[in-house]
């Protein structure tokens, strides 16, 4: 009873705090001068992190195993992973470009986890025999951390595409009364090969320069985070294969979850291969990462919605009451 009450309190505190953080972010977008509000939002995410950590630890103590056995618990762990990614730039004293991605991601995953759809999963249950293995912590935690990092990195790529797909960007200063012109991403790629081109061309507006800088930062941050996520995903798949061999006598069974995990891994492997070519990095790799974003959600939710295959533990069915 005490554990259930504590879990209930921590769940709602974490969701309430991250909701306030989102509101603060929206205010700071409208008015940049509210520096104190920005600091408050960062502290709010730290509070959210500790609340979710407390929730996971409470459930871990009560159940006797790491809470990663169903969709509800994995969503909580996913929210926790997003909050960790959010805090990395903060503690390194860097400007937190991740906050626009990680805070909403934490909000939506935490909101879905606490929604009425997963009410039946909130109750603590004994772990099914197939999941009673030391590989549970290794495999599932690596997969969820990989999903979190890949989702964040892919969202940076989506933002990259949104900015670069703007039809017209004026590159001449209006004060010079010169002919207005525009450039598309092929020109951005050309400039990307020469990092200081925008600095050396005096008639380019500062607005276009900072847009270019933002594009470069989105591409760089996306690449870094996807690299980390890809490592976690690879470790998760390999540890899952070892676990499968111990449990079912085969490293790979082409289970729906395994198949989509392999497809997701392949897409991001293609992403890294594309980035080895300087002429293709940026725009083309961002398209591949955006496809990977969709595949991750298919891999993560697909089996849980269908409730089939060897990975259908903790799946849920949507019930409609009339």
UniProtKB/Swiss-Prot annotation:
GO biological process: one example: cytochrome complex assembly
Gene Ontology molecular functions: heme binding
Source taxon at top rank: Eukaryota
Keywords per UniProt: Chloroplast, Cytochrome c-type biogenesis, Membrane, Plastid, Thylakoid, Transmembrane, Transmembrane helix
Transmembrane regions listed in the UniProt entry: 9-29, 44-64, 71-91, 97-117, 143-163, 225-245, 254-274, 286-306
Localization annotation: Plastid, Chloroplast thylakoid membrane
Entry GO terms, CC: chloroplast thylakoid membrane
Membrane topology: Multi-pass membrane protein
Known role: Required during biogenesis of c-type cytochromes (cytochrome c6 and cytochrome f) at the step of heme attachment.
Similarity comment: Belongs to the CcmF/CycK/Ccl1/NrfE/CcsA family.
Record's subunit section: May interact with Ccs1.
HAMAP family named among the record's database cross-references: CytC_CcsA (MF_01391)
Protein name in the entry: Cytochrome c biogenesis protein CcsA
């Amino acid at each position: 009873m005490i554990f259930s009450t504590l879990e209930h309190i921590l769940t709602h505190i974490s969701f309430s705090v991250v909701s306030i953080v989102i509101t603060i972010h929206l205010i700071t977008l409208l008015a940049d001068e509210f520096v104190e509000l920005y600091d408050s939002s960062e502290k709010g995410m730290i509070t959210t992190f500790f609340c979710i950590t407390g929730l996971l630890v409470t459930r871990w103590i009560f159940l006797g195993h790491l809470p990663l056995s169903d969709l509800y618990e994995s969503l909580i762990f996913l929210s926790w992973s997003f909050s960790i990614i959010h805090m990395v730039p903060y503690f390194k004293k860097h400007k937190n470009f991740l906050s626009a991605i990680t805070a909403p991601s934490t909000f939506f995953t935490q909101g879905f986890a606490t929604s009425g759809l997963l009410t039946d999963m909130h109750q603590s249950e004994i772990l099914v025999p197939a999941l009673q293995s030391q590989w549970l912590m290794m495999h599932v935690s690596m997969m969820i951390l990989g999903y979190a990092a890949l989702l964040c990195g892919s969202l940076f790529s989506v933002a990259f595409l949104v900015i670069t797909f703007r039809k017209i960007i004026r590159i001449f200063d209006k004060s010079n009364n010169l002919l207005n012109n525009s450039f598309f991403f092929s020109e951005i790629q050309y400039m990307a090969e020469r990092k200081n081109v925008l600095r050396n061309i005096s008639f380019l507006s500062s607005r276009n320069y900072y847009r270019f800088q933002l594009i470069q930062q989105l591409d760089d941050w996306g690449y870094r985070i996807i690299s980390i996520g890809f490592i976690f995903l690879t470790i998760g798949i390999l540890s899952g294969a070892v676990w499968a061999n111990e449990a079912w006598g085969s490293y790979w069974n082409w289970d729906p979850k395994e198949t989509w995990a392999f497809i997701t891994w392949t897409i991001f492997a293609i992403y890294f291969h594309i980035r080895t070519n300087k002429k293709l990095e940026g725009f083309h790799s961002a398209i591949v990462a955006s496809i990977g974003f969709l595949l991750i959600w298919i891999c993560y939710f697909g089996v849980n919605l269908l409730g089939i295959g060897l990975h259908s533990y903790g799946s849920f069915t949507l019930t409609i009451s009339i």
